[in-house]
Amino acid sequence: MLDLENIIVIGVSHENLSLLERENFMRTRPKYIIERLYTEKKINAYINLSTCLRTEFYIELNSNIKAKEIKNLFSVDMIVKSRVEAIEYLFKVGCGFYSVIKGEDQILAQVKGAYAEALENEHSSKFLNIIFNKSIELGKKFRTKSMIAHNALSLEAISLKFIKSKFPNIEDKNIFILGIGELAQDILTLLTKEQLKNIYIANRTYHKAEQIKKEFDIVNIVDYREKYPKMIEADVIISATSAPHIVVEYDKFVAQMKENKDYLFIDLAVPRDVDERLANFKNIEIYNLDDIWEVYHLNSMNRDKLLEDYSYLIDEQMEKLIKTLNYYK
């Protein structure tokens, strides 16, 4: 039986925890904790939506554990929603209500990715399948009708704006990218359109860097173990790795850096890749995800109006979902 009583969402995001708090939370290995509950059959199913701004678990409960008990497994302030409220929350997440850039497309792709991963690893359920399919369907419809994503700024586009504010003429600048995940590749796509001649990438797994080289012939591969000599020659260092620790270490960078050269770091990792003490140097600037959130939150008023005007689509989708669930009773 598909019972709304069994649906909860639990997690953290940039809206309820700071970057530092989210970093500490990720070090507790939350996915392992939820996976253990699933393995022990204390929950029926789960889907993990994990991005640079949020880590959330959409869970179908059973009689073996309560939402409060799951929350108590974690030591941080968690988002906990249940029943209709949990589903409405997912719908709004998929539509971009809680994104840094309201209505941006990337979150919908991430919802799709989370759902696909759950299907592949066989820890979803019929109930969660219905809910996530409805969310993805709504996300597409919402953007089409509201046109909220028209000329939308993505994280990578925002990063480029920060770079251009520091270096208006970036064509002759050296760009060094650490990590080649999805976000780093999106940034690389934008940078290649700027007629840059000097782009370097370093990744812990070398063959993955070689694959990127095939797609972006303009890039130069740097051995990850030899990253510092090339990094200190760069004007802009973009770091977006998935490492659980500092990647750009204070002592190693300071020992080799040029004091008469300006450096701009764009740190898009959670936990952060760049030792924040480097910002104490006058010739070094560091922007991280919280900086992006702070700056662009001020420019979201127009998008907020669109969210309000088209929120009726969420109500309509919820009605359709209830009808679907009633059909299976």
Curated annotation (Swiss-Prot):
A single BP term in Gene Ontology: protoporphyrinogen IX biosynthetic process
Sites where the protein binds NADP(+): G179, I180, G181, E182, L183, A184
Keywords: NADP, Oxidoreductase, Porphyrin biosynthesis
Pathway given in the UniProt record: Porphyrin-containing compound metabolism; protoporphyrin-IX biosynthesis; 5-aminolevulinate from L-glutamyl-tRNA(Glu): step 1/2
An example Gene Ontology molecular-function term: glutamyl-tRNA reductase activity
Enzyme Commission (EC) number: 1.2.1.70
Domain of life: Bacteria
Residues binding substrate, per UniProt: T51, C52, L53, R54, S99, E104, D105, Q106, Q110
Keyword Cell membrane: no
Active site: C52
InterPro entries according to UniProt: 4pyrrol_synth_GluRdtase, 4pyrrol_synth_GluRdtase_N, GluRdtase_CS, GluRdtase_N_sf, NAD(P)-bd_dom_sf, Shikm_DH/Glu-tRNA_Rdtase
PROSITE patterns tied to this protein: GLUTR (PS00747)
Pfam family, one: Shikimate_DH
SUPFAM superfamilies documented for this protein: Glutamyl tRNA-reductase catalytic, N-terminal domain (SSF69742), NAD(P)-binding Rossmann-fold domains (SSF51735)
Catalytic reaction annotation: (S)-4-amino-5-oxopentanoate + tRNA(Glu) + NADP(+) = L-glutamyl-tRNA(Glu) + NADPH + H(+)
Domain-related comment: Possesses an unusual extended V-shaped dimeric structure with each monomer consisting of three distinct domains arranged along a curved 'spinal' alpha-helix. The N-terminal catalytic domain specifically recognizes the glutamate moiety of the substrate. The second domain is the NADPH-binding domain, and the third C-terminal domain is responsible for dimerization.
Role according to the record: Catalyzes the NADPH-dependent reduction of glutamyl-tRNA(Glu) to glutamate 1-semialdehyde (GSA).
Family classification: Belongs to the glutamyl-tRNA reductase family.
Name listed for the protein in its UniProt record: Glutamyl-tRNA reductase
Organism: Fusobacterium nucleatum subsp. nucleatum (strain ATCC 25586 / DSM 15643 / BCRC 10681 / CIP 101130 / JCM 8532 / KCTC 2640 / LMG 13131 / VPI 4355)
UniProt gene name: hemA
